[in-house]
Amino acid sequence: MIQRPALVTPSWLEAHLDDPAVAIAQLRFEPDEDDYTAGHVPGARWWDWKAMLWHPTDRQFADPALIAQRLGSWGIAPDTTLVLYSGRNHFAMYGYWVLHEMLGHPDVRVLDGGRRRWELDGRPLSTVEPAITPVAYRPPRGARDDSSRASRDDVLANLGRTGRVLIDARSPEEYRGERVKPLPGFDHGAERRGHIPGARHLHGRDLFDPADATVKPPAELERLFRAVGAAPDQAREVIAYCRLSHRASSIWFTMTRVLGWHHVRVYDGSWTEWGSIVGVPVERPGAPAEHPEA
């Protein structure tokens, strides 16, 4: 199999803006609408991450046939190079994880630094939505590959297991149990505050250069992961989680695609699931372990 770089630079993308084999998508959630209409990478489609990747009613990823139908409706074929970016890097890396790892789309890339680096470089923006010609998309796999996911039952059954490290990628305030939601206006939280027992904290934001949002150099990433005992010679397995799994997918992406470490999975139920399950333990500094009650 040809190994393709998962991260692309703004200069690479600008050189491929007119390449018919390359499609660009800006992943967003509702507050980002004005960002897209005010100006976006030329040719970029505009995707609501949940509408593109999730089941229409269930708290579950859409099956490959449905995602394939959605991709085809946006003019994306199985041999298309798909470049994802966002105003928040986590969303693009989440999209990569779902589309490449679980769906099996062969060539997915993430724009390093996302929209921020693109604008800082003074690169062109467009207010024109691209013309789309739908195509037929045959799923590369017959079923979704869930091998990079961890379930709540798996996490619960292996709490404290030697060789397994849990990484909480939320903000320090969320980890300490001072709040559940990172920003006001979100409609999905949890019944309890705190973190999964034994989880070590590594804020997903710390994976990126604060100046331009690019991924930090490999040596710096390795230092961060070693500080929480997550390097391959320190842990047999790493499970990353956050609130909804966007920040956790950045842990997965940087470990697997930048450092080449493949002993990591994502608990995608994350805190919105764990923090509301009846009967599971919760740690919060200064408080005894909590067991949510009905």
Describe the function of each predicted region:
Residues 1-35, 115-194, 282-294:
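Flexible, polar/low-complexity N-terminal or interdomain linker segments that lie immediately upstream
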Residues 2, 219, 262-294:
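Extended hydrophobic/aromatic segments used for targeting, binding, or gating
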Residues 20-24, 106-107, 163-164, 237-238, ...:
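Short active-site oxyanion
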Residues 28, 50, 170, 205, ...:
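Anionic group-transfer/hydrolysis microenvironments
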Residues 36-42, 96:
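Glycine-rich loop at the start of a catalytic domain that most often binds anionic cofactors/ligands
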Residues 51-81, 200-237:
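Helix-loop module immediately N-terminal to the HCX5R catalytic loop
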Residues 55, 61-162, 178-179, 194, ...:
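Thiolate-centered catalytic microenvironments shared by cysteine-dependent enzyme domains
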